[in-house]
């Protein structure tokens, strides 16, 4: 599994959804953390298929983390990738960091020019809010909301605030 194989999986989901006779022509794609990066990359590859994009604490740090040799709880030599990387209870294959090692994620996401909502917590200890700010600057049409005190994976109070932003964005 890698971010790029997850993009392929999401592309298959989009194709399937588009094939259903009862689905709308408009698609709102949403992802959180790594799923946010996957959704952003997928929207960039298929800008005509995605009407709106919602990213909650998107993990645009993944390529930088791979280059630095630390991802989640794992540490490794980025110049000599091991076959397996142990991230706590979740082992990752070499392909996980390898797929993003040379990626400029902010360049990769810019082909998507549709509307984007980014919601990120100011107290996120996993993905610094600066990544969300940089993404908002990279997109042509982005709305960024920073949730004061929000961590990576919002708590109940922060969920409520994030859902308010999502509901307003989806209603437009």
Which residue ranges define each predicted feature?
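Alpha/beta-hydrolase active-site loop
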Residues: 1-20
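Short beta-strand/loop motif that positions the catalytic acidic residue
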Residues: 112, 118-120, 124
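Gly/Ala-rich beta-loop-alpha elbow adjacent to hydrolase catalytic centers
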Residues: 31-35, 39
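Active-site nucleophile elbow and catalytic-triad environment of alpha/beta-hydrolase enzymes
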Residues: 90-108
């Amino acid at each position: 599994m890698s971010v790029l194989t997850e993009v392929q999986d999401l592309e298959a989901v989009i194709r399937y959804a588009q094939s259903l006779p009862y689905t709308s022509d408009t698609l709102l794609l949403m992802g959180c953390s790594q799923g946010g990066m996957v959704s952003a990359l997928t929207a960039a590859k298929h800008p005509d298929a995605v009407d709106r994009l919602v990213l909650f604490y998107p993990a645009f740090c993944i390529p930088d983390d791979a280059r630095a040799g630390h991802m989640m709880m794992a540490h490794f030599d980025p110049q000599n990738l091991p076959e397996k990387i142990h991230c706590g209870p979740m082992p990752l294959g070499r392909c996980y960091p390898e797929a993003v090692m040379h990626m400029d994620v902010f360049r990769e996401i810019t082909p998507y020019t549709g509307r984007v909502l980014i919601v990120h917590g100011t107290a996120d200890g996993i993905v610094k809010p600066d990544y969300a700010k940089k993404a908002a600057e990279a997109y042509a049409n982005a709305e960024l909301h920073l949730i004061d005190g929000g961590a990576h994976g919002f708590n109940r109070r922060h969920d409520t605030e994030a859902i308010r932003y999502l509901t307003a964005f989806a209603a437009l």
